[in-house]
């Protein structure tokens, strides 16, 4: 008892000693603390801030902390021997020193210093310890403060530590031998790193440590330190820092936790925003691995850093992550990309910044692919600067080349930025089909992706959830599901196997499409394994033809599983490469056989059987292996073979050799085979015998009796044929002749008509035998048996027209074979016809081919002539001069070209034109000599030809007395003195009845070309014009041929002559030049005018907007011609109408062209 009490006391004492040792140690804090060693009889305040020391900042990890600096100029030392200094710890929060003692052998470690440098000051070190993020090393950093007295001396630092398992039976203070020492790695900056390996299993235990520092020959030893490594973990910085704009328009900052951290972390996020309008900074602490920043603006820059620390309990902040910068675009779409399924509704948001100014959401419009403007009914104004567009019931996106999405553009009214949002719409309607095997042990599901659009980077996965019993009425996707591995098969389907299975559990499954833009699920389907059973095919399938009945009997055995009632389906058909199957259903679950009628008893039939649940659930099984019938004789042959004979021997003798010939029986006649043939003989002397000839089809015997009857029987495994043919050979009957005539008519090389005429007879005719052979060949005789009622027969065989054939007709009586009728050639008339027809075989195809060729040629010529007369040649009824004329009257053509009272609205065909210089002279005098030529006409007549260098002198128009105009002509100076390439010019006038004679006189003025008058052959051509004033027209040809003088012609004659002469001019330069044609006419007349087009070759109405009352000229044709020749400053109404070049097309679009592409010159 005393011993036990003593042991208990010792145990309590040891425990108290250990606890005391731990209590005397300094608990290391997660933040930095300081080791201070000071001289004796000095207060802590004096030590902390002596004379010549000041505060400075130093930091191991970036923070600035209070430190002591030493100024050597203000401090003096004296030599001291055996001076004891106290070392203690103090934290940043507590300025008082802790755990100091002056007894070397006492309760704490003290440092003894024999030096004169610590008379009035001590030494200081910053210490910070933590457990590395990988939880393997405990690290302590020791950093000497700036201006340390021994900073110029090399110093060494050692860390002594003891693990908890070594402290067994330890005294109050651990002995020196129980500590382990590690050497600390010191850098040139007086910063030392001490690494203590800590087992993972001891992270929650307490670790005792102390520091031993040697510097300048002085040894410093710190008091004990205690720490739990798990409370000093310093995680690694967060990884994968990234930023993105969310679907709600916020900036999402996200990152990943560092690995190997055994507890959750909290995070500190600091970010700054820099934009043209806002600059802000923020610092937030969150427990999640993401942070949302609202109020994002386009064209802004964000810089973010993150660090982590233990969420619950003590810990050390990690280092800051690498800064990450994110810049927003001028146009922000959120979300920037959307992946959705067919039939869904999605929305895009947009913020638009234009020239450092955010556009109002009311001014934003949306476009699809820059080709289709989205209706405003789909817009929503979220805020002043955020616009929203919604798409309803989307259709599948059709790929356009490499683009598999639709581009959605957010635009500032009519200005669109090049950035766009992407809309992916795919059809996720994937059909999943499942079947349970016949052993009810596994369920196989198959599905294909051929029906959906494949997106790059997408993966497909089948997911399912099993319910405890049956399926719900409406399957739905459960948030908790399991994936199933599926493998691609050679047929393009994916196949997944569920094994084991629960027959009555509902398996809800769907296909999940995983993509970086999101996930889509196909419509779910629920499968009950018991409802998709595919039974094993029926076994022991047999097929046979029943004897004497001829039915196809099929039998089978029902599979073991499932135990439900089954229905069966049979298919059968004639065996061959391609079997034409016939189907037969058996609904009686107890049936195991069935008999079916077949048309051919002697054919080989292939039979297969399959089964399915009779309640409609499940699937059809596979077809069983085919079973085949065996051809067997089911009955005796229906009849014997047809046969004929060949008689050889002297016709004068009584004995002849008769060879019987017959054709083998078909299967449908022999039912189903013939093993042998038997010939029965019966003679007139009542002699009867049989001969077995086996399978031969020829037999010869000797005919010696007056009458000899033979019968050929067919015998199979069941018996001999019942109905047989008899043939009697009789000498008397061989002389009976009832065939009067026999004729053969060849139709072609494969058919000959044989006809005959019979005479009356007392014998009963049974049938005929037709026999024929080629006389030029030693071939076998061919024969046919035909009915006795036939008088004409078509023989189908290969006949050569130049060969000779023998045809024989034998009448067969009951008493015997009659006398035959034999012919050796075809009928004479038909022979000649056939010989004539031989040439037709060559002539007729030639005639037919020639006729077809001639017909095709006529059709082509007809089309060309039709085009020539009806398309290339214009319809005269569409011409203006033909309006109101009746071409049905003969007198119309007599006066057609004599007189025209209406103005001509279209000129002759123009050749390649060139800018010209010309004058127009008047042949008829003015009534009023004082009147002047109208200004508009003068301006046209005085056109300056800048290109040719020719100037028309038109001053005479302002001074000449037009009463004397007949002897007056406008002169023109041509500097180049070369002949112009102008073919003609046109002047047309339709004066109103109220117009004065002076205006009409102008029309009769003479016309002079812009070249020397002495070289002009046309000077006097129009002096005595006899044209009507209402339809006067002048055609002025350039002086290309001096010998050609245009005579005075009527209008129609002049037009024809001009067209004839026009083709004689040489081709000119092909360079394109602007050309202008003017016609002078009244507005009233011109509005009803017509214009000739070069394509249609007909006259079409001249557009009213082309009247010079509202002058419109094509923009690319506006030139100095209009500026020089039209006095647009006058207010008088213009009476000129533009004559469009005939090389352009007059169409229904003329008005639109005039409105859109012509420059308005209206005064």
UniProtKB/Swiss-Prot annotation:
Cysteine disulfide links: 37-88, 87-97, 129-140, 184-194, 350-410, 411-416, 434-445, 471-526, 486-496
Motif (WSXWS motif): 620-624
Motif Box 1 motif, chain ranges: 869-877
Cytoplasmic topology ranges: 861-1163
Pfam families given in the database record: fn3, Lep_receptor_Ig, ObR_Ig
Residue segments, region Leptin-binding: 465-482
Sequence segments annotated as region (Required for STAT3 phosphorylation): 896-904
Keywords linked to the UniProt accession: Cell membrane, Disulfide bond, Glycoprotein, Membrane, Obesity, Phosphoprotein, Receptor, Repeat, Signal, Transmembrane, Transmembrane helix
In-chain residues carrying the UniProt-annotated modification Phosphotyrosine: 984, 1077, 1139
Keyword Signal: yes
Principal location: membrane
Membrane topology reported for the UniProt record: Single-pass type I membrane protein
SUPFAM superfamilies listed in its UniProt record: Fibronectin type III
One GO-annotated biological process of the protein: T cell differentiation
Location(s) in or outside the cell: Cell membrane; Basolateral cell membrane
Location of Phosphoserine modifications: 880
TM helices/strands, residue ranges: 838-860
Cleavable signal peptide: 1-21
Domain of life: Eukaryota
Entry function: Receptor for hormone LEP/leptin. On ligand binding, mediates LEP central and peripheral effects through the activation of different signaling pathways such as JAK2/STAT3 and MAPK cascade/FOS. In the hypothalamus, LEP acts as an appetite-regulating factor that induces a decrease in food intake and an increase in energy consumption by inducing anorexinogenic factors and suppressing orexigenic neuropeptides, also regulates bone mass and secretion of hypothalamo-pituitary-adrenal hormones.
Assembly and interaction partners: Present as a mixture of monomers and dimers. The phosphorylated receptor binds a number of SH2 domain-containing proteins such as JAK2, STAT3, PTPN11, and SOCS3. Interaction with SOCS3 inhibits JAK/STAT signaling and MAPK cascade.
Name under which the protein is recorded: Leptin receptor
Gene coding for it: LEPR
